[in-house]
Amino acid sequence: MQRNSRALLGGQAAAQLGLLLLSGLSLAGLGALGLRQELAKALEPNQVAVAGNDWRGASFPVENFQAYTSPFGYRASPDGTYNQEFHKGLDMAAPEGSYIRNWWAGRVVEVSDNTACGTSIVIQSGEWQHIYCHMKGQIETSGGGRYLSDRTGGIQIWEGQLVPAGARIGRVGMTGRPTGPHLHWGLKYASRYVDPAMVLRAMFAQQSGSTISSRSQ
């Protein structure tokens, strides 16, 4: 398992050669807020590494998904403390306690429970980082290491651990600054935040094409 994960990470690092410049923005969210598109273009990263990535084995990040509740981009502050803020991820509503699955094989580089993100995990997959927020559980230490512990859910995830795509890494909770049970899912490519919805669309297109191709053979 460890050898396969390392090989996959190496392939993902090479995928940056296929960087594709996309002009699509979170227009639905921006339109709902009535914000100027030119302001969004100036501040919202719009480079997404889509070409060259093989996401046929990637996983949707939450079980019992109900709805997308807040898109990537500018929005009104959910708690009313700001007129607008930049939302660095995609919120996915699911019943509290629903399991969260790792999107893509990688290594856990950070576990935390002391920010607005609540109990959270950051996983590195080549040039990609995926961030999971508002999870159940807390961060504990043992033998000089740190890990996310959710005993009720049977989850124990250590910093430095290799995690395959689709593995259960936590559960939807209400830690941090949530307005209801949901997963906040953030994505970075080469240290820049990108719109997770764009990546999901590319992933679904690849997976649908793979299914059609296998049926035709």
Q: What function would you assign to each model-found segment?
A:
Residues 35-120, 125-126, 138, 165, ...:
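Surface-exposed, glycine-biased beta-strand/turn segments
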Residues 95, 101-102, 111, 128-166:
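Short histidine-centered loop motifs in beta-beta connectors
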Residues 127-128, 191:
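Glycine-centered tight beta-turn/hairpin loop motif at sheet-sheet or coil-to-beta transitions
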Residues 183-191:
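A short hydrophobic beta-strand segment most commonly corresponding to one strand
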